[in-house]
């Protein structure tokens, strides 16, 4: 029988309903993929734009490595995948604020961990593509949250021990054009457009994140399809290479395929697993 907290929470009953007020549907929110006998770590997966909390991590042969592979190598973990959408179910043309969506992640995590008495359990995030800025924005929000006797959202940031960012946008040469656009559009009518607001949120999040990133271990995973040159691949590490307590690896796959592994023998999966096991040992 499914546990009630595996599904989107009913806002009317939530202790933090006023903070977490985004519309939810059956495909968004947290979903439990695995829970070991004595979990020591919460692994939280966050997909990219227009992704799915299960399908995005599932290979063509039906293997979802978060559910089917990782528990075999790390049995004492709890794995949850978080789904989100930037449009509402009622109106596909209504765009939700990326900031508000990232705040929802914090609220969902706190609600689930509170209801299962696991508020202080260590967290490791695994984020793909836009999921990276979502997680970074969520952690910045949690870090600045003011706690109350019943709700302490800051515990989400304080419990975070690691993050794996897979194919996520960083402040490197690929975002120079976006930064130029913001500088040009500032003070004009474009400043009120959704495009400007989204770009401003992304750049601001990436610029602010280093202020908290040194508090935990980070692995940056970069895609390297056959068509990508070595120089282009190295450029992907430029912005984050100086971050303390971080490592970089490359995966021979395209953007969508880099988070799908068909078996426990997959070379890319072995790289990810090695780093997760390392974090697990550090937390013992």
Question: How would you describe each model-predicted region?
Answer:
Residues 82-86, 168, 223:
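Active-site loop/turn elements of alpha/beta-hydrolase fold enzymes
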Residues 72-88:
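Conserved alpha/beta-hydrolase
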Residues 24-76:
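Short, surface-exposed "cap/lid" segments of acyl-processing enzymes
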Residues 50-55, 87-91, 130-135, 163, ...:
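Eukaryotic short linear interaction motifs
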Residues 55-61, 92-96, 137-141, 175-181, ...:
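Short coil/turn segments at secondary-structure boundaries
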Residues 1-13:
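PEST-like, low-complexity acidic/proline-rich intrinsically disordered segments
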Residues 43, 50-51, 78, 90, ...:
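C-terminal catalytic-base region of ester-bond hydrolases, centering on the histidine
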Residues 47, 89, 99-212:
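Serine-dependent carboxylesterase/thioesterase catalytic core
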């Amino acid at each position: 029988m499914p546990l009630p907290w595996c599904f989107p929470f009913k806002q009317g009953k939530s202790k933090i309903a006023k903070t977490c007020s985004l519309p939810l549907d059956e495909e968004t929110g947290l979903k439990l993929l695995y829970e070991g006998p004595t979990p020591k770590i919460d692994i939280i997966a966050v997909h990219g734009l227009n992704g799915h909390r299960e399908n995005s991590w599932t290979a063509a042969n039906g293997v979802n490595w978060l559910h089917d592979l990782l528990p075999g190598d790390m049995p004492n973990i709890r794995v949850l995948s978080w789904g989100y959408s930037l449009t509402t179910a009622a109106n596909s043309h209504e765009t939700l604020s990326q900031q508000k969506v990232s705040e929802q992640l914090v609220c969902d995590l706190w609600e689930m961990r509170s209801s299962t008495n696991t508020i202080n359990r260590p967290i490791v995030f695994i984020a793909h593509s836009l999921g990276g800025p979502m997680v970074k924005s969520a952690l910045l929000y949690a870090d600045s949250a003011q706690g109350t006797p019943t709700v302490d959202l800051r515990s989400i940031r304080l419990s975070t021990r690691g993050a794996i960012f897979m194919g996520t946008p960083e402040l490197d040469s690929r975002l120079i054009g976006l930064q130029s656009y913001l500088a040009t559009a500032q003070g004009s009518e474009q400043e009120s457009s959704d495009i400007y607001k989204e770009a401003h949120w992304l750049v601001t999040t990436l610029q602010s994140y280093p202020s908290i990133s040194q508090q935990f271990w980070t692995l940056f995973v970069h895609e390297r399809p056959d068509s990508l040159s070595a120089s282009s691949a190295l450029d992907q590490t430029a912005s984050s290479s100086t971050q303390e307590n971080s490592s970089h690896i490359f995966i021979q796959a395209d953007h969508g395929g880099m988070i799908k592994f068909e078996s426990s023998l997959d070379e890319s999966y072995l790289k990810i697993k090695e780093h997760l096991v390392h974090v697990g040992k550090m937390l013992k």
